[in-house]
């Protein structure tokens, strides 16, 4: 069977879209959005990171991340502190850590539902294939 690449690409995008919609909808129950929770997750993984690093980690432009981070500061979820030179470091506040932790619970539930139709071996194979096309080693840990 020959697989059309555009159909394959669309199938990957459709699965991602379904997952993102479910996450965004359920994260609302803890007062967050997927974009906000993803930013908190990136800051939690790399406390003190710059906006440039966090923008790359969350697949956003620096400008978009800066706007989002500003909203997170106003909400009391993130603290910005001067770093080396002109660098601004980002840290979670205790409330930001609480929302991040609650979001992990939501994400585990949503992702369990999204992947429930796959056996563990199929999940491992899917992860390996996605990492292969991403150019990452299969055994590399990451988000």
Regions found by a protein language model. Name each.
Residues 51-52, 63, 88:
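Residues within helix-turn-helix
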Residues 6-10, 30-41, 124:
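Short alpha-helical elements of helix-turn-helix
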Residues 46-49, 60:
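The short coil/loop that forms the "turn" connecting the two helices of the helix-turn-helix
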Residues 1-2, 120-143:
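C-terminal regulatory/oligomerization modules of transcriptional regulators
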Residues 48, 70-131:
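Charged, amphipathic alpha-helical coiled-coil/dimerization segments
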Residues 1-30, 77, 92, 98, ...:
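N-terminal leader segment of winged-helix/HTH proteins
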């Amino acid at each position: 069977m020959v697989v059309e690449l555009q159909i394959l690409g669309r199938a990957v995008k459709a699965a991602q879209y379904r997952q993102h919609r479910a996450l965004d909808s359920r994260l609302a129950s803890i007062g967050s959005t997927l974009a906000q929770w993803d930013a908190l997750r990136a800051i939690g993984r790399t406390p003190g990171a710059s906006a440039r690093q966090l923008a790359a980690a969350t697949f956003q432009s620096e400008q978009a991340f800066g706007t989002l981070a500003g909203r997170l500061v106003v909400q009391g979820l993130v603290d910005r502190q001067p770093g080396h030179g002109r660098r601004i470091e980002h840290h979670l506040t205790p409330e930001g850590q609480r929302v991040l932790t609650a979001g992990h619970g939501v994400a585990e539930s949503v992702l369990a539902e999204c992947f429930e139709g796959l056996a563990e071996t199929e999940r491992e194979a899917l992860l390996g294939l996605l990492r292969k096309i991403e150019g990452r080693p299969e055994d590399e840990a990451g988000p």
